[in-house]
Amino acid sequence: MDAIQAIKERRSINFFETGKDIPNDKLKEMLEIANLSPSSFNLQPWKVVVVKDPERKKILKQCAFNQPKVEEASAVLIMVADPGAMEENIDRMLDSWQELGYMKPEMRETYEGMTNNLYSEPNSLKRKIFAVKNTSLFAMNLMIAAKGLGLETHPMDGFDEECVKKEFNIPEDKIIPMLIAVGYLRQGITLLPRAFRRSIDEFVKFEKY
């Protein structure tokens, strides 16, 4: 399946085949593909908690207002946006740029200063927005990769973030933009036609808003 077909055929699935496992090798392949996502200064501020154990999914379901798909999906991925990724990853990023010829050694301090000026302190709003924006790019690529690998997904915004952090040992300074249920469409389910989409004429402007 090519990328355009995967995008066109991806749907947010509410009815997953229960009890059907996704091999860890396939999950890892999906995550490796998603990890090719672009990110600001290549800082990659995403982390993922994979929840497959039935008992752990029950707990996550409670944090997600008892939505059945959390328990029925083969796995649920907790998307974690890390505002502290700049400090964690900047040295490796700059080393890579220098080794591969993207940056001359004398420009290192300049790039360090640029990232500090652009993203401010770790607990700032700018830094939180940076983390969520880039983690969302990763999440979208993950869903396209999943479709290409024969899996179905559903991104979820309906959950108690503090509950998820507490139950899954996620540090308080991290942000959870979404959960993504991953699995297989339940046998016998026929999806309804894709819901309303606006015409691009309604939301696309050229040259100015």
Spell out what each predicted region is.
Residues 1-209:
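Acidic, surface-exposed loops and disordered segments
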